[in-house]
Amino acid sequence: MLQLDFHQQLGSLELHVQSELPANGITAIFGVSGAGKTSLINAVVGLTRPDGGRIVLNDHVLVDTQQRVFLPPEKRHIGYVFQDARLFPHYRVRGNLRYGMAEKMASQFDDIVNLLGIEHLLNRYPLTLSGGEKQRVAIGRALLTAPELLLMDEPLASLDLPRKRELLPYLERLAKEVNIPILYVSHSLEEIVRLADHVVVLDKGKVKAQGLLEEVWASSALRPWLPKDEQSSILSVRVLAQHEHYAMTALALDDQQVWVGKVELAQDAVLRIRVNAADVSLVLQPPEKSSIRNVLRASVEECIDVDGQVEVKLAVGQQTLWSRITPWARDDLALHPGQMLYAQIKSVSITA
């Protein structure tokens, strides 16, 4: 676990962070440019010194200003992947990977190389690598130092779209197969949806929201950054069954089910789906005959008027589903908090 309780004045920005981050999975640090994202992880790794407070990683005190404790970066056991890979140009890939490698990681060298798909690059120099290949090597080098925590500062920011698409699957594999907590700085909501388990939203140096991705996404914290036509819900589901006759998979959403195109995952595998608010219509009674496969029981939590539309927050079991309808539809259905109804979902996408 990473415990943060510190403040730091950085020019006109006052960074004040109070948070406990989990000891597993990817925690995304999200915010616009200047929100304090990179400043936060620089304080964690020891590149800057907080003005006051404590930083504790797995019960090891890294910073305690009252006790005058400030552990230097090289003693914190933290890996750092920068926006630019920062490889040594005079070393081949193999040499870059072995630079700073912990003795106990020698036996895992081949596993990490295979995980990142860089076996064929070992004898090449950094100048001959693409941006995505350089970042994979940088990630491998960080992992081979045997870190207790891995920091990634917008690792896709300097890459063009094809290179981003090349690297994302490796990051997804990394999150699932390497048992090291990762702090992932990004201002891209798409990256967060694909990769993050937890999210911390920073705004002007302060924590605006934090928690599981599904919970933070369902709150109002991220909604200002989403274009009007991209307001959506993230739902946690698990594989229930495959359709006997059609290429469709049933996913369990609490005590209900959602049908999606065939998913090649084992039964009970957990994944996330994304549903755009504009693809959710509301009815008071379930339709008898309809082309829409997914009709879920839901209850109204609140209705919010936004730019001439109404965003309806629905409770589906323990999770939140958003619908966007017209004021006319809201009035016609006489929507009010606590009302039971049915949500018709026209389209579902798999995120992770």
UniProtKB/Swiss-Prot annotation:
Q: Which GO terms describe its cellular component?
A: plasma membrane
Membrane topology, as annotated, equals: Peripheral membrane protein
Summarize where ATP binds, as residue positions. G31, V32, S33, G34, A35, G36, K37, T38
Record-annotated disulphide pairs: none
> Which InterPro entries does the annotation name?
AAA+_ATPase (IPR003593), ABC_transporter-like_ATP-bd (IPR003439), ABC_transporter-like_CS (IPR017871), Mo/tungstate-bd_C_term_dom (IPR008995), ModC_ABC_ATP-bd (IPR011868), Molybdenum_import_ModC (IPR050334), Mop_domain (IPR004606), P-loop_NTPase (IPR027417)
Superkingdom is Bacteria
| Keyword Repressor tagged | no
- Entry coiled-coil feature ranges: none
Q: Which keywords does this Swiss-Prot/TrEMBL entry list?
A: ATP-binding, Cell inner membrane, Cell membrane, Membrane, Molybdenum, Nucleotide-binding, Translocase, Transport
Report whether Nucleus shows up as a keyword of the record: no
**Function text:** Part of the ABC transporter complex ModABC involved in molybdenum import. Responsible for energy coupling to the transport system.
Q: Name the family.
A: Belongs to the ABC transporter superfamily. Molybdate importer (TC 3.A.1.8) family.
Name assigned to this protein: Molybdenum import ATP-binding protein ModC
- The record's gene field reads modC
